[in-house]
C-alpha cells in the first residue's frame, strides 16, 4: 500500500494554513521558546544545510507542544545587508523590492518543508515598524553614554565604499580583503559611531558560567573578551614615557628589548633620523596586513629597529626599541617588554635579529624559549621565588616607586556601529549648526526610496547624496541627518525579543509597555537556540550585550537571552566538500521534495548522524529514508487493530516511548529514529492483531519527524486533525520488564543466529523455532544431526556431523 507524497503535502499544507494550526498558544503554565538563527534572505533560497537545523527545532517544538507546553517557534528575516545592496548596484533594482521577493521564496520553501513556524510572528529587520524599535534602542544606548561618535581606525573597502567589521574580512596572501568579493581593505581614520561594549566586558564574561552552551563556544567568547590582569610599567625612551602592559612582571630582569606596534602613537617621535625612512616604510607595509596574518605565529617575524633605547624602570638597563607587526595596537598599550628566553614569539624575533636572550626562570635548556613554571634565577632580589611570589613582590615595588600600576586589560574592542551603506537602519540623529547632536524621538526615521544608491565617493554613505532627505529644518534651525547607517548586526541583536512583541506580521507593541514586560516574563529566556558556530563572537556577543543593557533599563526580565545553545553541523556535498556553487555540489531542497517528499528529507537529515556532526550528503541515505517511511505507512495501514492488549508488545512499545522521549529532550534525534524503527520491526514480527493505542502512539512519535504522513495516518486511524494537538504518549514503567528473551542459536558451538521468544518457552518449542530459521536450515540441510541441546531462556546448540 503506497501513497503520493505530493497529494498528501498539498492537502495538509492547505489544512494548516486555513486552520492556523501553528499559531502560538498561551494556555499553559509551561513554556518553551525554540528559536532558529534567522536567515539572510538571499536570492538562492534555503539549502539543505538550513533544512538540518530547522528540522531539528521543528521536531523539538512539536514534541514540546504535544507535552503540554506553550511553544513559541517563530521565523523572520535578517533582511538588511551588503549582498542586497551590491545586487542592487549591479542590476539597478531596488534592494528593498529584491529582498521582499527573496523572502517570498524562503517562506514558500519553509512551508514546503512542513515547519511549524507561527508566521503571525514573522519579522523583517528591514521593515520600518521593526527598525523603529532598533532606533529606539540606539537612543537608549546614547542616553546611557554607551553610544559615542568618535574618530577611530577602521577597515575601509574602497570598492564596496564602506567600513567593514573584522568578521567581514578575510586574509588573502597576508593582506586584508573583503569576505564578499575579496576586494582590498585598508586601514584609515574615520568618524564613526561606536557602542561601548567594553563597559560590559566583566558581566559578559561572568554570565557565561550560567549558560548551557557548548564549552567551545563559551571559550571562544572568553578568549574574544580576553581579560588579563597585570601591571602597566613606564619605560622611558628619550624622556618620552612609553607604557607597557605585562602579566609577567616577575620576568623584568629578562627584558632584552621592547617592541611597539606600527600604529603606536609614539613610534615616529622616538625614531632616530637615521632610521626614520626605514620605519616609515615598515609602517606603510603593516597597514595592509590583516590582523589574522599578524597574529599567525607560524609566519616569519618582521620588524625594524627605531635607533632608540628604552630604560628598564627597575634595573635602569638600556634596551633596544623595535617596531614589529606581531604587536597589535588594539591590545594593552600597543607596546610589549620582550623576554625572549620565556616567550615563543619573542624568541623567534630575537633569534632572527640576533638580540640577547636572558633566562630568568630555572630550566634545563637554553636552546628554546622556556614557558613553563620554575624558580626565578638571575634576578637579584627575586632569586629563588616562585612565579606568584615574584609577581607580588615586583608589583608592590613598581607601585611604591611610581613606575607601575595594576591594570586589567581586555582584547575586546568597542563595537564599530556605523557603515557607509544605503541599505541599513538610519540613525535617529541630527547634527546642528555646530555639529551638536540631537536625537530624533519621533520614530521611525525611514530610508528614502531612491534609485541611485551608489557610494558617494567621499567616504560617506549613498544617503549623503539625497539632499532633500539629509537636510532638515526645525523651528527655523537647519540640521543635517546622520548619513551612515547601522550594521546588519543591529537588527539581529534584539530580534529574539521582537517575536514576543509581534502582533501580526511586522506589527509590534511598544517594547517599553506593560504588556511587553508581561510577555517577556512569560517567554524569556530562549530555551533552545540553534545555529552555526560562526556567530560565536559576533552576533551572540552583541545580542548578549544588548540584552544586558535592556535588562538594566528594566525592559527585559532576564540578563541572559539564550539559555541553551546548540550548533548544528554542516551538510557537506556528496564529495565531502563544503557545498558551493563553484564546486557544483549544492543540493536544492526543492528538487528533493519533488522526488522524495518533505518527510523523507526531514527524516534523512535527522538520521544522518548526531546533530552537531558535519556529514556528506548521500543519495542512498535519502532513498532509504523514503523506503522506511513507506514501510511505516504500510505497517499502520495493513495491521489489524484491537482494543484488547495481548501484552506481547508491552515491553518494546513502552521502552521505545521512554527512549524516544529522553533522546528528543537531549537532542539525539538520530537515535530516536532508530527506536521508531525497532517498533516497526516488532509489529511486523508480531502475530495477530496489535493493540490500537500502541499504533496510535507510534504515529504520534513519527509525526514530529514526518508531519505530513503523521497527519494523514492519524486521520486514516479515524481521528480528526490535527495530530499536533494530541498528547505525547506516556510509557508505563511497570511494563519495562521484558517478557521475552533472546536465544542464541549455535551449530557445533558456533553462533549462527538469534531469535527472540517469550520467557519460559519449552525446549521442544525452542528446537522447533530454531530449525525454521533460514540461517540454521542452510547448515543442517542434508546433514546428520548427532545431538540437540536446548536450555530454556538461554541457548540452542545443534551438533551435526
Curated annotation (Swiss-Prot):
Q: Which InterPro entries match?
A: aa-tRNA-synth_I_CS, aa-tRNA-synth_Ia, Leu-tRNA-ligase, Leu_tRNA-synth_edit, M/V/L/I-tRNA-synth_anticd-bd, Rossmann-like_a/b/a_fold, tRNAsynth_Ia_anticodon-bd, Val/Leu/Ile-tRNA-synth_edit
Give the chief site where it resides.
cytoplasm
One Pfam family hit: tRNA-synt_1
GO BP terms: namely: leucyl-tRNA aminoacylation
Question: What organism is listed for this UniProt entry?
Answer: Mesoplasma florum (strain ATCC 33453 / NBRC 100688 / NCTC 11704 / L1)
CDD domains to which the protein is assigned, alphabetical: Anticodon_Ia_Leu_BEm, LeuRS_core
Q: Which domain of life is it from?
A: Bacteria
Reaction catalyzed:
tRNA(Leu) + L-leucine + ATP = L-leucyl-tRNA(Leu) + AMP + diphosphate
Instruction: Indicate what this protein is called per its UniProt record.
Output: Leucine--tRNA ligase
Amino acid at each position: 500500500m503506497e501513497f503520493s507524497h505530493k497529494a498528501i503535502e498539498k492537502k495538509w499544507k492547505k489544512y494548516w494554513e486555513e486552520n492556523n494550526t501553528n499559531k502560538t498558544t498561551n494556555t499553559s503554565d509551561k513554556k518553551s521558546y525554540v528559536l532558529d538563527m534567522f536567515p539572510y534572505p538571499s536570492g538562492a533560497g534555503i539549502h539543505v544545510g538550513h533544512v538540518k537545523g530547522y528540522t531539528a527545532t521543528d521536531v523539538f517544538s512539536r514534541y514540546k507542544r504535544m507535552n503540554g507546553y506553550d511553544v513559541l517557534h517563530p521565523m523572520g528575516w535578517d533582511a538588511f545587508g551588503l549582498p542586497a545592496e551590491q545586487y542592487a548596484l549591479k542590476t539597478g533594482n531596488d534592494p528593498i523590492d529584491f529582498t521582499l521577493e527573496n523572502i517570498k521564496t524562503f517562506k514558500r520553501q519553509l512551508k514546503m518543508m512542513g515547519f511549524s513556524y507561527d508566521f503571525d510572528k514573522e519579522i523583517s529587520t528591514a521593515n520600518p515598524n521593526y527598525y523603529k524599535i532598533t532606533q529606539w534602542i540606539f537612543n537608549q544606548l546614547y542616553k546611557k553614554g554607551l553610544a559615542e561618535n568618535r574618530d577611530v581606525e577602521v577597515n575601509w573597502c574602497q570598492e564596496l565604499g564602506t567600513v567593514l567589521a573584522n568578521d567581514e574580512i578575510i586574509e588573502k596572501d597576508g593582506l586584508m580583503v573583503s569576505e564578499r568579493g575579496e576586494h582590498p581593505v585598508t586601514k584609515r581614520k574615520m568618524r564613526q559611531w561606536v557602542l561601548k561594549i567594553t563597559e560590559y566586558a566583566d558581566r559578559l564574561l561572568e554570565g557565561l558560567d550560567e549558560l548551557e552552551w557548548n564549552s567551545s563556544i563559551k571559550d571562544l567568547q572568553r578568549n574574544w573578551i580576553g581579560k588579563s590582569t597585570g601591571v602597566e610599567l613606564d619605560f622611558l625612551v628619550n624622556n618620552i614615557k612609553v607604557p607597557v602592559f605585562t602579566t609577567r612582571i616577575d620576568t623584568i630582569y629578562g627584558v632584552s628589548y621592547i617592541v611597539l606596534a606600527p600604529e603606536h602613537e609614539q613610534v615616529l617621535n622616538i625614531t632616530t633620523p637615521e632610521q626614520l625612512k626605514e620605519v616609515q616604510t615598515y609602517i606603510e607595509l603593516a597597514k595592509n596586513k590583516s590582523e589574522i596574518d599578524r597574529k599567525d605565529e607560524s609566519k616569519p617575524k618582521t620588524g625594524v629597529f627605531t635607533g632608540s633605547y628604552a630604560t628598564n624602570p627597575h634595573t635602569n638597563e638600556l634596551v633596544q626599541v623595535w617596531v614589529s607587526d606581531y604587536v597589535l595596537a588594539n591590545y594593552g598599550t600597543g607596546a610589549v617588554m620582550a623576554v625572549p628566553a620565556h616567550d615563543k614569539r619573542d624568541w623567534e624575533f630575537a633569534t632572527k635579529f640576533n638580540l640577547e636572550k636572558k633566562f630568568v626562570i630555572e630550566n634545563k635548556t637554553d636552546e628554546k624559549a622556556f614557558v613553563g613554571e620554575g624558580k626565578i634565577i638571575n634576578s637579584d632580589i627575586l632569586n629563588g621565588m616562585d612565579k606568584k611570589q615574584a609577581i607580588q613582590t615586583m608589583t608592590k615595588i613598581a607601585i611604591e616607586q611610581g613606575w607601575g600600576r595594576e591594570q586589567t586589560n581586555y582584547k575586546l574592542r568597542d563595537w564599530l556601529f556605523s557603515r557607509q551603506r544605503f541599505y541599513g537602519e538610519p540613525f535617529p540623529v541630527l547634527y546642528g549648526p555646530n555639529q551638536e547632536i540631537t536625537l530624533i524621538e519621533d520614530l521611525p526615521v525611514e530610508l528614502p526610496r531612491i534609485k541611485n544608491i551608489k557610494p558617494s565617493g567621499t567616504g560617506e554613505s549613498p544617503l549623503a547624496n539625497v539632499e532633500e532627505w539629509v537636510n532638515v529644518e526645525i523651528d527655523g534651525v537647519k540640521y543635517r541627518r546622520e548619513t551612515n547607517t547601522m550594521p546588519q548586526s543591529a537588527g539581529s541583536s534584539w530580534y529574539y525579543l521582537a517575536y514576543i512583541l509581534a502582533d501580526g506580521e511586522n506589527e509590534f507593541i511598544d517594547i517599553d509597555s506593560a504588556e511587553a514586560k508581561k510577555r517577556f516574563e512569560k517567554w524569556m529566556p530562549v530555551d533552545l537556540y540553534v545555529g552555526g558556530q560562526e556567530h560565536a563572537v559576533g552576533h551572540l556577543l552583541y545580542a548578549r550585550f544588548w540584552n544586558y543593557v535592556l535588562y538594566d533599563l528594566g525592559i527585559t526580565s532576564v540578563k541572559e537571552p539564550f539559555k541553551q545553545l546548540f550548533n548544528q553541523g554542516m551538510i557537506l556535498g556528496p564529495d565531502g566538500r563544503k557545498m558551493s556553487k563553484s564546486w557544483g555540489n549544492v543540493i536544492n531542497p526543492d528538487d528533493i521534495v519533488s522526488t522524495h517528499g518533505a518527510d523523507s528529507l526531514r527524516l534523512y537529515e535527522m538520521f544522518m548522524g548526531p546533530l552537531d556532526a558535519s556529514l556528506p550528503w548521500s543519495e542512498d541515505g535519502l532513498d532509504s529514508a523514503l523506503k522506511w517511511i513507506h514501510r511505516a505507512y504500510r505497517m499502520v495501514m495493513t495491521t489489524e487493530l484491537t482494543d484488547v492488549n495481548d501484552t506481547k508488545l508491552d515491553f518494546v512499545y513502552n521502552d521505545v516511548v521512554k527512549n524516544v522521549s529522553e533522546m528528543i529532550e537531549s537532542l539525539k534525534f538520530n537515535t530516536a529514529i532508530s527506536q521508531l524503527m525497532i517498533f516497526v520491526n516488532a509489529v511486523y514480527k508480531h502475530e495477530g492483531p496489535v493493540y490500537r493505542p500502541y499504533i496510535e502512539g507510534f504515529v504520534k512519535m513519527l509525526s514530529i519527524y514526518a508531519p505530513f504522513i503523521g497527519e494523514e495516518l492519524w486521520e486514516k486511524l479515524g481521528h480528526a486533525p490535527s495530530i499536533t494537538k494530541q498528547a505525547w504518549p506516556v510509557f508505563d514503567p511497570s511494563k519495562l520488564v521484558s517478557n521475552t528473551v533472546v536465544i542464541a542459536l549455535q551449530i557445533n558451538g558456533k553462533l549462527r543466529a538469534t531469535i527472540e521468544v517469550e520467557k519460559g518457552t519449552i525446549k521442544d518449542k525452542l528446537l522447533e523455532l530454531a530449525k525454521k530459521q533460514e540461517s540454521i536450515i542452510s547448515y543442517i540441510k542434508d546433514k546428520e544431526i548427532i545431538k540437540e541441546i536446548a536450555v530454556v531462556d538461554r541457548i540452542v546448540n545443534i551438533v551435526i556431523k
